[in-house]
Structure formats: structure tokens, C-alpha cells
């Protein structure tokens, strides 16, 4: 029965990972820790010249 329980556990984890955690809520560019890390993330990936954290999301802008 242990193999069956393990298989069910993996199935539940897979379903939760796919549907339960939308990617827009994931931390990006060092947020919420530092606006400086967010700014370098934007410059490095050529998303803009400046970056600012809005919660856990790094927002890049061109100024």
C-alpha cells in the first residue's frame, strides 16, 4: 500500500502545483526584498531602465 499512497501523494502535489499556484504571485526580480535588485533585474534582462517592487512583483519601467 505504500507505493499506492506515494503515487496518490505525487498526483495531488502535481495538481496543486499546476492549478493552485499562479505564476504572477511568485516572487520575481528580488522582490519583496530590495528595489535595487529589482532594478538590476530589469536592466539585465532589458525590460527597462528602472524597477520598483509592488509586493512580490518587480515592475519595470522606461524613463
From Swiss-Prot:
Compartment(s) of residence: Secreted
Transferase in keyword set: no
Matches recorded under PROSITE patterns: BSPN_CSAB (PS51862)
- Provide the primary localization: secreted
Molecular function, one GO term: potassium channel regulator activity
The record's account of tissue expression is: Expressed by the venom gland.
Family indicated by similarity: Belongs to the long chain scorpion toxin family. Class 2 subfamily.
Kindly give any further remark recorded in the entry.
Answer: Negative results: shows only a weak inhibition on Kv1.1/KCNA1 (20.85% inhibition when tested with 1 uM of toxin) and Kv1.2/KCNA2 (7.23% inhibition, same conditions).
Q: How is this protein named in the record?
A: Potassium channel toxin Sp4
Q: What is the protein's species of origin?
A: Scorpiops pococki (Scorpion)
Amino acid at each position: 500500500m505504500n507505493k499506492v499512497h506515494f503515487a496518490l501523494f505525487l498526483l495531488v502535489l502535481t495538481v496543486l502545483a499546476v492549478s493552485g499556484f499562479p505564476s504572477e504571485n511568485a516572487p520575481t526580480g528580488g522582490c519583496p526584498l530590495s528595489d535595487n535588485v529589482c532594478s538590476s533585474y530589469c536592466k539585465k534582462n532589458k525590460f527597462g531602465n528602472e524597477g520598483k517592487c509592488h509586493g512580490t512583483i518587480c515592475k519595470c519601467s522606461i524613463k
